[in-house]
């Protein structure tokens, strides 16, 4: 006996007088889509790889048998809403070295982005930092199998290589990203501003949303093309014939994002992260990683140059290490030398008794 998505029950039976012990299934009948397996036929019988045998577990055959560890992260640790953040904690806990990957972008002979895109941030009190890079010669298509599998394992639906890259970077770094189709960025200008009376936007989910004055939007020279930190606009989405892309990696005011998401009834994974007040220093490595993946997947040419507008960056904080008070509060007897070692494992610098708090650590 088997159950298919949608409540379809498969049992032994007879079909045209012959015994039937099963059913040949299409992607759709298995609850899968062409986004997951782009080289299959959605409505036809799904032909599996030649090396599988009758009786093999379908999850193993299609690479859907990865082990997923679910962590419950408290709201005061947004730095752990990412693979890198969790790796840092795991490295410290198991006393293993943390291997950092520095994204490398080669650029191309396609020129510079500076004569193609202009960015203005009049709502600087709501946008701490706005970073953008451009990719031309884009070839939209399915992502490679390894990328689709990693996204699916994290509950993210694969869409296409460019959109998948932005989602993958968000999982790695905890930094939400967005990609705009440059064709639809009027006047080659991006403006981070507050919405005005009577403005509307149709978001990527197909819903027309009236905007209240004061909501933070990403606009071009004429109109809103995205809800900042929440969801992009349908009028600038990445489609099959997109050839030039603007990558956005920004840091928005968490309170503003939360209020807009609540007012519109539109909470997304991106808005949930921005509400926690992310580290503004993430925007550069995230956009660099996205461009590195573009080059690795050979799906476009990264233009030289990075637009990086910084309005507010938190000042470095320093704390005094007080071993006696810490042990009193925790009811422990941890030696001071061990405390310093624990902090250093967490990549928190300590000089004497002065702790320098990293920008990523709340």
Could you describe each region identified by the protein language model?
Residues 1-362:
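RNA/tRNA-interacting regions in translation and RNA-turnover enzymes
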